């Protein structure tokens, strides 16, 4: 979100929230500004995130230094298995750097996935979103298989996962918030939601 200041320049003043439906599931996208002063906002949003789409401004290498500071701060808060996909944005502009140049100049690992994108034209945005959702699905696929077996036996699930009552409550509540399962608290059962599969 940007606002025009008295000096006629536009400045970032807030965050964006988007919801996209994929395979019947709502994917919540929280867009935080790429400015250092929004650290507190990023720290709050990163808690509980399932994946990160990190955008580099491919047309303005002078913004990379702040970008790397932000990326490193975010990485420290993430669980190790949390996937990150990178975007080399503004490919619609003349002189925009190729994704491999962005990778090299920012010391991203060789296996990091980086898409050439343009938020203005929509280039590769769907592909990047599908990629990160697939990575998230792969992270959850093993637990979803186990959950399907124990839908009417929470105690059996707790035993299988070696979790106590509080840990089970937290796990199931978290999965319900993320809309992977629906909990029936009266019957003390849950149901894994249909539709979870890899996106092509």
Per-region residue spans from a language model:
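Key DNA-contact positions within bacterial/archaeal DNA-binding proteins
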Residues: 166
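Short, cationic-aromatic polyanion-contact patches
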Residues: 139, 151-153, 183-200
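Switch I (G2) and immediately adjacent beta-strands of P-loop GTPase domains
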Residues: 2-37
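Conserved beta-strand/loop subsegment of P-loop NTPase cores
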Residues: 50-55, 77-92, 108-117
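Conserved Switch II/interswitch segment of TRAFAC-class P-loop GTPases
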Residues: 35, 48-69, 78, 91-96
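Canonical P-loop GTPase G-domain recognition
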Residues: 92-142
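Short amphipathic alpha-helical interface segments
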Residues: 136-161, 169-170
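Glycine-centered, phosphate/nucleic-acid-interacting loop/turn motifs that mediate DNA/RNA or nucleotide
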Residues: 179
């Amino acid at each position: 979100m940007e606002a025009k200041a008295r000096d006629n320049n536009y400045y970032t003043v807030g965050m964006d929230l988007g919801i996209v439906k994929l395979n019947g599931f709502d994917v919540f996208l929280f867009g935080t500004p790429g400015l250092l002063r929004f650290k507190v906002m990023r720290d709050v949003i990163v808690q509980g995130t399932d994946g990160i789409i990190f955008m580099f401004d491919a047309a303005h290498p002078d913004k990379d230094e702040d970008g790397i500071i932000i990326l490193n701060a975010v990485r420290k808060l993430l669980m190790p298995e949390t996937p990150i996909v990178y975007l080399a944005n503004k490919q619609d502009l003349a002189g925009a750097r190729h994704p491999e140049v962005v990778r090299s100049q920012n010391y991203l690992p060789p296996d990091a996935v980086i898409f050439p994108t343009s938020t203005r034209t929509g280039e590769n945005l769907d592909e990047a979103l599908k990629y990160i959702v697939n990575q998230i699905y792969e992270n959850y696929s093993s637990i979803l298989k186990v959950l399907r077996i124990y839908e009417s036996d929470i105690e059996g699930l707790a035993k299988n996962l070696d979790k106590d009552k509080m840990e089970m409550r937290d796990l199931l509540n978290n999965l319900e918030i993320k809309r992977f399962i629906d909990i029936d608290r009266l019957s003390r059962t849950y149901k894994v939601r249909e539709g979870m599969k890899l996106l092509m």
